[in-house]
């Protein structure tokens, strides 16, 4: 049975969940392209997906903003069809053994500051800045950082007059506690400064592998938030950033010094990290850690395969004394065995297919996994966002949740 939305998009398997609603892999039937489809039950009050889709539409045209293909209602669901993206920074962080190099962190920081600045220029704050909500593009856009999930976004100023929202206190925590600003923990209304402070914690998370306030135990969620808040406030910025370039501490101190309605100096923050980038002698080649890991795994797999073939060739010759001294091709023909072709060297720019059947080594499996991850395919993921990945740990290729199948979405049965 084939499920369709908007009479143009084929609904596939579930690939994640956003702030509100579930996300599915889909196909644009006319174009033959894969898309991401976000669904929300029409009974949801207020209709969060409708609000989020309106924000996305306001953001359209910005660099690193996913393209919206279609919005509407289908059966019992509100639907938003979006551009399909690659893995999140959280997925890639795990892929890189939870450690990014300084070069990769600085390349990311530059783009992430720009994404947040763009959202602010459109009169909104994101309020959930975290690694899961930054995704890499696919194909030619593989080096572009996207920002997603506007389910918690809020307008902070009037679009026409630029009148800022008023300062308020006693607000509940909105966002993710791990990356929330101190003022957010204190119940203060969020503004532009809070998005940027959250980004500072994300960058230190990439440096450290984890933040000091992770893994704290508590009986209730409220108590856990309080423990995180206490640890965050009792950890001086200089202690958090100790052992890393001073620019990270400078960044966080700058964010914390901003007043509620201040416009941040985004250019200053970008330049802070760009100057560090140049002093380190890095090149703006947009080669991230996961690119190197992918290529390194490919080279290692190729070397291992070459070594395996050499071993087999030596073993074959040792078992067949009559063929010693003959070229391998001649001996192969003489004995009626299959000719063994020399392995094709793997280079970054050329991949020659080898159609000969052969066992797949562990190293080669790792290479394929790394390449699939780089393209956005599933590798033990659990992201909460719009991605081009499949959560195979929870759902098989053929599974589509029953509540979607019975929703009144257009069904096409091929016999």
From Swiss-Prot:
Q: Which reaction does it catalyse?
A: L-seryl-[protein] + ATP = O-phospho-L-seryl-[protein] + ADP + H(+); L-threonyl-[protein] + ATP = O-phospho-L-threonyl-[protein] + ADP + H(+); L-seryl-[tau protein] + ATP = O-phospho-L-seryl-[tau protein] + ADP + H(+); L-threonyl-[tau protein] + ATP = O-phospho-L-threonyl-[tau protein] + ADP + H(+)
UniProt keyword DNA damage present: no
| Pfam families reported in the protein's UniProt record | Pkinase
Q: Which residues form the Protein kinase domain?
A: 9-277
Q: Which GO terms describe its cellular component?
A: centrosome; Golgi apparatus; nucleus; perinuclear region of cytoplasm; plasma membrane; spindle
Q: What class of enzyme is it?
A: transferase
Q: Which domain of life does the protein's organism represent?
A: Eukaryota
**Where in the sequence does UniProt note compositional bias of the Polar residues kind?**
347-358, 380-400
Q: How does it assemble?
A: Monomer. Component of the circadian core oscillator, which includes the CRY proteins, CLOCK, or NPAS2, ARTNL/BMAL1 or ARTNL2/BMAL2, CSNK1D and/or CSNK1E, TIMELESS and the PER proteins. Interacts with DNMT1 and MAP1A. Interacts directly with PER1 and PER2 which may lead to their degradation. Interacts with MAPT/TAU, SNAPIN, DBNDD2, AIB1/NCOA3 and ESR1. Interacts with AKAP9/AKAP450; this interaction promotes centrosomal subcellular location. Binds to tubulins in mitotic cells upon DNA damage. Interacts with GJA1.
The family assignment reads: Belongs to the protein kinase superfamily. CK1 Ser/Thr protein kinase family. Casein kinase I subfamily.
Q: What is this protein called?
A: Casein kinase I isoform delta
What organism is recorded for this protein? Pongo abelii
Q: What are the top taxonomic ranks of the organism?
A: Eukaryota, Metazoa, Chordata, Craniata, Vertebrata
Q: Which gene encodes it?
A: CSNK1D
């Amino acid at each position: 049975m084939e499920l369709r939305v908007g009479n143009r998009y084929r609904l596939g398997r579930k690939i994640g969940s956003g702030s509100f609603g579930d996300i599915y892999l889909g196909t644009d039937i006319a174009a033959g392209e894969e898309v991401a489809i976000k669904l929300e039950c029409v009974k949801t009050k207020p209709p969060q997906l409708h609000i989020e889709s309106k924000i996305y539409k306001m953001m359209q045209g910005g660099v690193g903003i996913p393209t919206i293909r279609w919005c509407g209602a289908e059966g019992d669901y509100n639907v938003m069809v979006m551009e399909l993206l690659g893995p999140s920074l959280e997925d890639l962080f795990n892929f890189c053994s939870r450690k990014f190099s300084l070069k990769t962190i600085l390349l990311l920081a530059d783009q992430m500051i720009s994404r947040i600045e763009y959202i602010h220029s459109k009169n909104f704050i994101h309020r959930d800045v975290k690694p899961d909500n930054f995704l890499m593009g696919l194909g030619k856009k593989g080096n572009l950082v996207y920002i997603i999930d506007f389910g918690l976004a809020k307008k902070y100023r009037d679009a026409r007059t630029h009148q800022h929202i008023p300062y308020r206190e006693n607000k509940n925590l909105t966002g993710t506690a791990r990356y929330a600003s101190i003022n957010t923990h204190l119940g203060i209304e969020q503004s532009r400064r809070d998005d940027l402070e959250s980004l500072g914690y994300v960058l230190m998370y990439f440096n450290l592998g984890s933040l000091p306030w992770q893994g704290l135990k508590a009986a209730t969620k409220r108590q856990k938030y309080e423990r995180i808040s206490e640890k965050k406030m009792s950890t001086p910025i200089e202690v958090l950033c100790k052992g890393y370039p001073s620019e990270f501490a400078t960044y966080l101190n700058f964010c914390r010094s901003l007043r509620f309605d201040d416009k941040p100096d985004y250019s200053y923050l970008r330049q802070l990290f760009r100057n560090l980038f140049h002093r380190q002698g890095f090149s703006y080649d947009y080669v991230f850690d996961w690119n190197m890991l992918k290529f390194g795994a490919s080279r290692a797999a190729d070397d291992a395969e070459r070594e395996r073939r050499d071993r087999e060739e030596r073993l074959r010759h040792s078992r067949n004394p009559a063929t010693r001294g003959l070229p391998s091709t001649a001996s192969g023909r003489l004995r009626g065995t299959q000719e063994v072709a020399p392995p094709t060297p793997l280079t970054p720019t050329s991949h020659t297919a080898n159609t000969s059947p052969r066992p797949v080594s562990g190293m080669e499996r790792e290479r394929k996994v790394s390449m699939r991850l780089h393209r956005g395919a599933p590798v033990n993921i659990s992201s909460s966002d719009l991605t081009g990945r499949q959560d195979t740990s929870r759902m098989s290729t053929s599974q589509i949740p029953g509540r979607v199948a019975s929703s009144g979405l257009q069904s096409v049965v091929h016999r």
